[in-house]
């Protein structure tokens, strides 16, 4: 019997993008922004006016993604979930950072095959049984079971089942497996 499929977003769900992005912004613009200050998806609304949309240029810096940390318990959770699910890393990303992101996954999650990494723009086109993502927009178009991974920018979102951390995300996936 085929195992059910589990898609997992990369940025802020598996890695610590939110923290490192804000840290890098603070270094450049001499600010004291905290990840907890960001209450919505459009980060340019929370930075200094002279930064604005230039905040997204940080994401294109060479090797920025290679230096991100891993969310607590994510490595263990994914490794344990591989016995139940075929796991895919699904990232909506700019083409210039695919190599860095792929290398980060290879380094941090060596048990995930490169064949199980999907770079796309519209996650609604990816057919999986479950998707874990911190971006509600990605979950809106997804047809399978949806789990919103908790982040400062999605605190006001209440349309989806929420996992506050990887302990909860793992437990939710395990509880869904019998219904797939």
Curated annotation (Swiss-Prot):
Enzyme class: hydrolase
Stored Pfam families: NT5C
Single GO term (MF): metal ion binding
The keyword Transmembrane helix belongs to this UniProt entry's keyword annotation: no
InterPro entries according to UniProt: 5'(3')-deoxyribonucleotidase, HAD-like_sf, HAD_sf
Residues bound to Mg(2+): 9, 11, 134
Entry EC number(s): 3.1.3.-
Keywords of this entry: Hydrolase, Magnesium, Metal-binding
Cofactor: Mg(2+)
Protein name, as recorded: 5'(3')-deoxyribonucleotidase
Organism: Clostridium acetobutylicum (strain ATCC 824 / DSM 792 / JCM 1419 / IAM 19013 / LMG 5710 / NBRC 13948 / NRRL B-527 / VKM B-1787 / 2291 / W)
Lineage, uppermost ranks: Bacteria, Bacillati, Bacillota, Clostridia, Eubacteriales
């Amino acid at each position: 019997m085929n195992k059910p499929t589990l898609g997992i977003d990369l940025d802020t769900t598996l890695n610590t993008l939110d923290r490192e992005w804000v840290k890098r912004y603070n270094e450049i613009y001499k600010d004291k922004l905290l990840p907890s200050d960001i209450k919505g998806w459009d980060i340019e609304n929370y930075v200094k006016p002279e930064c604005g949309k230039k905040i997204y240029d940080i994401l294109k810096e060479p090797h920025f993604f290679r230096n991100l940390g891993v969310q607590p318990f994510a490595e263990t959770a994914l490794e344990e979930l591989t016995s139940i699910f075929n796991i895919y890393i699904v990232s909506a990303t700019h083409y210039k950072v695919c190599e860095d992101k792929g290398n980060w996954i290879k380094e941090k999650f060596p048990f995930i095959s490169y064949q199980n990494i999907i770079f796309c723009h519209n996650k609604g086109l990816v057919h999986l049984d479950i998707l874990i993502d911190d971006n509600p927009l990605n979950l809106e178009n997804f047809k399978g079971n949806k789990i919103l991974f908790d982040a400062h920018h999605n605190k006001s979102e209440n349309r989806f089942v929420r996992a506050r951390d990887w302990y909860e995300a793992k437990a939710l996936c395990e509880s869904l497996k019998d219904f797939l």
